[in-house]
C-alpha cells in the first residue's frame, strides 16, 4: 500500500488504541481528513511550504502544458514529503519518488493504469453523464479527485456536485477547494464523504496551513448530528462503508488459477 492510501486508512480509523494502561498513554490525535497542498510545477515557494507546512502530502500540478523541467524541479524539492504528480494523462512510469499520480483526461490510454506498485487517482467531473458516472467504480484506480475550486467558497451547489460523485463510488475521494476551508466547511466536507482536502498553496502561508490543520484535528470522526425531520433518507452510507472506502484489489496471479485445477 502506498503512503497516501495508508494515511487515508489511518484517518478513517481515527486514533489507534494505545498499548499498556490507557490512562498512562497519550493517544495520537488523527484528523478525520487529510490536508494536501497543490503547487504549480516550478513553484519554489509552494514546494517550501509543502516541506515546512503542516501537510499530509503535496500534489505537483503539471497539467495544461507545464514544462517537464518545472515538474522535475518541484519533485526534487519535495524530499521527505509524500507527494504525487497531477498530469492531463496518466503515465506508465511515475517520476522518481512520487507516491501517487493524478490524471484528468478520459482519453488516457488504459495501459497507463496497469500495475499495482503505485496509487492512481482520477479526476472526475461531477457533470459527467449519468451513464458514464455510474461506471467509475469499475475503473482500475484507487481514488477519485473532485475539484470544487471553480467557486470561491463552499456552497450548497458544490456539496450537491460532490454528493453526485460520492453516491456512485466507495473509493476514496479527494476534494480540491479554492481556498482554505473554515471549520464549518470542513465539517460539511467530512459529512459528504471526503477523505482528503486539497488546497492551493499559492497565496497560503505556513501559519494559515497550520491553523487549518488544527481545525482538522479538532473535528470529530463522526458526522454532525442532523436536525430532526420527517422523510429524510441517508444515501451516502451505502457508498461509504463505516470501515472506510474500499480500494481496488490487485489482479490475481495466473499461477493461482493453475493451482485450482485437478
Residue ranges and their predicted role:
Residues 15-20, 62-79, 89-92, 100-118, ...:
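Active-site-adjacent beta->alpha loops and helix N-cap segments on the catalytic face
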Residues 85-91, 127-135, 173-176, 222-235:
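Short, basic, helix/turn surface patches
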Residues 98, 122, 137-143, 148, ...:
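ATP/nucleotide-binding catalytic cores
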Residues 31-39, 56-62, 81-88, 100-104, ...:
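Hydrophobic faces of well-ordered beta-strands that scaffold small-molecule active sites
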Residues 45-50, 90-97, 127-138, 179-197:
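Catalytic cores of alpha/beta
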Residues 72-74, 203-262:
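C-terminal helical cap(s) of enzyme catalytic domains, especially alpha/beta-barrels
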Residues 54-57, 75-85, 96-99, 116-118, ...:
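Structural alpha-beta junctions
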Residues 1-85, 247-262:
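Conserved N-terminal beta1-alpha1 strand-loop-helix module at the mouth
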Amino acid at each position: 500500500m502506498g503512503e497516501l492510501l495508508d494515511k487515508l486508512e489511518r484517518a478513517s480509523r481515527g486514533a489507534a488504541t494505545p498499548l499498556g494502561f490507557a490512562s498512562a498513554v497519550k493517544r495520537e490525535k488523527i484528523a478525520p481528513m487529510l490536508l494536501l497542498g497543490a503547487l504549480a510545477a516550478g513553484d519554489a515557494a509552494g514546494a517550501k511550504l509543502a516541506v515546512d507546512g503542516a501537510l499530509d502530502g503535496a500534489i505537483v500540478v503539471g497539467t495544461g502544458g507545464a514544462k517537464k523541467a518545472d515538474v522535475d524541479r518541484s519533485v526534487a524539492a519535495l524530499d521527505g514529503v509524500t507527494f504525487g504528480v497531477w498530469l492531463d494523462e496518466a503515465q506508465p512510469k511515475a517520476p522518481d519518488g512520487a507516491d501517487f499520480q493524478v490524471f484528468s483526461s478520459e482519453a488516457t490510454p488504459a495501459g497507463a493504469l496497469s500495475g499495482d506498485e503505485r496509487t492512481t487517482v482520477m479526476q472526475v467531473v461531477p457533470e459527467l453523464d449519468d451513464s458514464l458516472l455510474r461506471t467509475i467504480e469499475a475503473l482500475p484506480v484507487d481514488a477519485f479527485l473532485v475539484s470544487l475550486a471553480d467557486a470561491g467558497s463552499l456552497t450548497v451547489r458544490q456539496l450537491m456536485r460532490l454528493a453526485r460523485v460520492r453516491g456512485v463510488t466507495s473509493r476514496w475521494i479527494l476534494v480540491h477547494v479554492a481556498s482554505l476551508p473554515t471549520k464549518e466547511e470542513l465539517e460539511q466536507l467530512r459529512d459528504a464523504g471526503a477523505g482528503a482536502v486539497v488546497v492551493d498553496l499559492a497565496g497560503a502561508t505556513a501559519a494559515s496551513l497550520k491553523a487549518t490543520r488544527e481545525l482538522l484535528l479538532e473535528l470529530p470522526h463522526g458526522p454532525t448530528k442532523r436536525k430532526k425531520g420527517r422523510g429524510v433518507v441517508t444515501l451516502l452510507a451505502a457508498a461509504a462503508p463505516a470501515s472506510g472506502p474500499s480500494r481496488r484489489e490487485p489482479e490475481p496471479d495466473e499461477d493461482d488459477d493453475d493451482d485450482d485445477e485437478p
